[in-house]
């Protein structure tokens, strides 16, 4: 951490085909062991599969899925007087999108199926429709925040 001032926030780059930052964020989160070309391959194949399934623009499906999964509020563990409380905190847009992408990928990895392309495309389509594991995770987080609203003053 710098003592001289605040570090500038890096702007997310866009991917070569769709020219979209969300796709690039997705690629960087799906990445394992530095194999970025494989990550791009998985994402682009999943987008093609979404195109075939829904017959709509896959980017709009991705945006809709991420918008549906993005949480407005989350809980953070805070230790006060020897006991740990789950304190609800508001989440910014960038952090919310990052969480949504993480939840979408986690839900797709847990899905039964043949390969990651199939699982990711299915999860994105489900999330865009308002169902699926990632949506359930968001609702669970919101429920937790609502249940612990009494501790909101600990922020």
Swiss-Prot record:
Protein name (database record): Small ribosomal subunit protein uS7cz/uS7cy
UniProt GO MF annotations: rRNA binding; structural constituent of ribosome
CDD domains assigned to the protein according to its UniProt record, in alphabetical order: uS7_Chloroplast
Chain's role: One of the primary rRNA binding proteins, it binds directly to 16S rRNA where it nucleates assembly of the head domain of the 30S subunit.
Family, as annotated: Belongs to the universal ribosomal protein uS7 family.
Family matches, as InterPro entries: Ribosomal_uS7, Ribosomal_uS7_bac/org-type, Ribosomal_uS7_CS, Ribosomal_uS7_dom, Ribosomal_uS7_dom_sf
A Pfam match: Ribosomal_S7
Quaternary structure, from the entry: Part of the 30S ribosomal subunit.
Entry keyword Nuclease: no
BP-aspect Gene Ontology terms: translation
Key words of the record: Chloroplast, Plastid, Ribonucleoprotein, Ribosomal protein, RNA-binding, rRNA-binding
Subcellular location per the Swiss-Prot or TrEMBL entry: Plastid, Chloroplast
GO cellular component: chloroplast; small ribosomal subunit
């Amino acid at each position: 951490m710098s003592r001289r001032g605040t570090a500038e926030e890096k702007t997310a780059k866009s991917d070569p085909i769709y020219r979209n930052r969300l796709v690039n964020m997705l690629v960087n989160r799906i990445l394992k062991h530095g194999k970025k070309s494989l990550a791009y391959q998985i994402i682009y194949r999943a987008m093609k599969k979404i195109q075939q399934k829904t017959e709509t623009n896959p980017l709009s499906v991705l945006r809709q899925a991420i918008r549906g999964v993005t949480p407005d509020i989350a809980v953070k563990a805070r230790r006060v007087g020897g006991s740990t409380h789950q304190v609800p905190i508001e989440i910014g847009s960038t952090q919310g999108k990052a969480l949504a992408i993480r939840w979408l990928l986690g839900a797709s990895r847990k899905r039964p199926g043949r390969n990651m392309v199939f699982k990711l495309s299915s999860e994105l389509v489900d999330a865009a429709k308002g169902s699926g594991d990632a949506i359930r995770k968001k609702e669970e987080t919101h429920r937790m925040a609502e249940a612990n609203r009494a501790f909101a003053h600990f922020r």
